[in-house]
Regions:
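Short helix- or helix-capping micro-motifs
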Residues: 164-169, 196, 216, 220
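Interfacial juxtamembrane loops and adjacent helix segments
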Residues: 11-12, 74, 78-138, 281-333
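Hydrophobic, aromatic-rich transmembrane alpha-helices
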Residues: 148, 343-370
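C-terminal luminal/periplasmic domains and tails of membrane-associated envelope-modifying transferases
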Residues: 2-19, 25, 451-556
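Signature aromatic-anchored transmembrane alpha helix within multi-pass, membrane-resident enzymes
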Residues: 37-40, 231, 259-262, 267, ...
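Perimembrane helix-loop-helix junctions
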Residues: 197-205, 229-265, 278, 360-371, ...
Length: 556
């Protein structure tokens, strides 16, 4: 069996930097500046994420995950949120367990109601509970920064690693979603980790192929949208084992390598469910649609627990709903295939965009880097293509894997040994960093300078690109400080409970238009989709204030 893994002759990949000559000791003095810069970059990212998390109220999806996490930890039941596998929620559950909230085991309600009940109706402090729930995701996000650094360093040297890490640490999307108790960044980081380990398997397949599978399994056990990456990473594992082997069994070893990745990934998914409930009890408490055709066949063939397959059916059911989107000021029904590329153009710093394009070109065009191109570019391209076919045009979080993979590619630009290239990379990294830092602490509604910055993002995009319900606490402070005693009419899009934060407001859509006088407060996502009475109310009002670039205060 050992012969199936590796042959006596192992070729060293030409794309890796040449090691130091034999007998030449590595001087520790050369390492500490790099280590110091890595620590500084991660420390500033941690500061940005923690201080952002402290001030934000629950976003739309977070109560669902926090409620499910509490249920997993305290009741060990698979009842709610089947459309997402449990591993990412269990990570959130670590923070929930440390917060030790009061949990009502007898509560009956859907997953959204469960989260709101836990946060606002059970005697818990939602500020404290949400911070604890977010901290494990923040820690994971920081650890994925080390993967970005290590991947780029192995391809193009320590300076490339630092450039890649800087782009990662200053990515507004990564900071925004890495500081929330959600699943997008944990899933994306797990795919990146698997790709990096598969790349390393070109040298040591017996060590890294068995590690790449669990990393891929962690992604699959966190978000089902990572499934398209499975054949990509299996194929790359086969290529790595093939390259590391010699002799007549190369093809057999390559097939075994791909199989090991698949088998260990499947095992991780099963283990994640068994961690919640060793008996895998599953009785759906929500409608599970019947899926026909090729999709239905693929779901039935998945080698996962029935709850996972039902979750896939729920996801396909969500894809069939009549959603609305908002892009460049236009409200539309359905979805647009070019939505995600367009949204990324708005929400990515300009310097970062330039380095992404240059990095992809260098990885493909430079001969020494070309063997690494599939490992860096294939998985994100396949995931992006799959996401572009989705029915829900809700935000760049569906493509948050791009800032991770393309940061690695961008660092590889430094493989072009020209002084002007090094200067250009430094300037573009600095430009991206300054653009990101200027948005602090409003990373969720970030847009780059070409589109007017965070204050104008609501003109181009909606939902989690701008307003995900995160600023209800800031709104309460603003109303108390600037508008005490005034009549407030509120249209809020989010999962928070306004009255908990001291906001006494009425719904202006429930009374005649002429009775709405005073302050009209509208979430920007609601304003983007306004029609009928709400559109009339906004049209007859004048904006007087802005809260977090996600809520607009009008006066009537």
């Amino acid at each position: 069996m050992r012969d199936l893994w590796i042959a006596p002759a192992v070729a060293r990949p030409v794309s890796l930097p040449s090691p130091a000559p034999a007998g030449t000791p590595r001087r520790p003095g050369r390492r500490w500046p790099v280590r110091l810069l890595v620590a500084v970059l991660l420390a500033q990212m941690a500061f940005a994420m923690v201080t952002t998390a402290v001030r934000q109220t629950p976003t739309i999806d977070e109560p669902v995950y926090v409620g499910a996490a509490a249920e997993y930890v305290h009741e060990h039941r698979l009842r709610h949120n089947p459309e997402h596998p449990p591993l990412g929620t269990l990570v959130i559950g670590v923070g929930v367990a440390l917060a030790d909230p009061h949990v009502d085991p007898g509560f009956a309600g859907d997953q959204g109601q469960l989260g709101r009940h836990l946060l606002y109706e059970s005697g818990n402090d939602p500020w404290r509970l949400m911070l604890w729930a977010r901290l494990p995701v923040i820690a994971l996000t920081l650890s994925f920064g080390l993967v970005v650094f290590a991947f780029a360093r192995e391809l193009a040297g320590p300076l490339a690693g630092l450039a890649a890490l800087a782009l990662y640490c200053f990515s507004p999307d990564v900071i925004a979603h890495g500081s929330l108790a959600t699943l997008d960044v944990p899933a994306a980081g797990s795919v990146l980790t698997s790709a990096w380990l598969v790349w390393r398997a070109r040298r040591r397949p017996r060590l890294y192929v068995p590690l790449a599978g669990p990393a891929l399994g962690a992604a699959l056990a966190t978000k089902m949208s990572t499934l398209p990456a499975v054949p990509v990473l299996m194929a790359l594992a086969a290529v790595s084992v093939w390259k590391a082997s010699a002799g007549g069994l190369r093809l057999v070893r390559a097939v075994v390598g791909a199989g090991v990745v698949a088998l260990t990934a499947i095992t991780v998914v099963w283990v994640a469910y068994l961690m919640v409930d060793p008996r895998l009890r599953w009785t759906p408490e929500q409608h599970v649609p019947v899926v026909h055709g090729l999709r239905g066949l693929l779901v039935r063939l998945l080698p996962f627990p029935e709850v996972y397959r039902d979750g896939m059916r729920v996801q396909f059911g969500l894809e069939n709903r009549p959603w609305q989107g908002f892009l460049f000021g236009r409200l539309y029904d359905g979805s647009l295939w070019y939505y995600l590329p367009s949204a990324l153009l708005v929400k990515t710093p300009l310097g970062m965009l330039a380095l992404w394009v240059a990095g992809a070109a260098v990885v493909v065009g430079v001969r020494r880097l070309r063997p690494a191109a599939p490992y860096v570019l294939a998985a994100p391209l396949v995931l992006l293509a799959a996401a572009m076919q989705g029915a829900r045009d809700f935000g760049t979080r569906y493509a948050v894997f791009l800032p991770l993979f393309l940061a690695v590619a961008a660092g590889c630009v430094l493989m072009v040994r020209r002084r002007w290239v090094s200067v250009g990379v430094a300037l573009l990294v600095a430009f991206a960093a300054v653009s990101s830092a200027r948005a602090y602490p409003y990373y969720l509604p970030y847009s780059n300078e070409a589109f007017g910055g965070p204050g104008r993002t609501r003109e181009w995009l909606h939902d989690s690109n701008v307003d995900w319900g995160q600023d209800l606490g800031r709104l309460a402070d603003r109303l108390r400080d600037r508008y005490p005693g005034e009549r407030v009419w509120l249209v809020y899009k989010g999962s928070g409970v306004p009255s908990f934060y001291g906001i006494e407001a009425s719904d202006p859509r429930r009374v005649p238009v002429q009775e709405v006088r005073g302050l009209l407060v509208v979430s920007d996502s609601a304003a983007a989709k306004a029609s009928g009475r709400l559109a009339e109310l906004i049209g007859g009002s004048r904006p007087v204030d802005d809260v977090g670039h996600s809520i607009t205060v009008y006066r009537r």
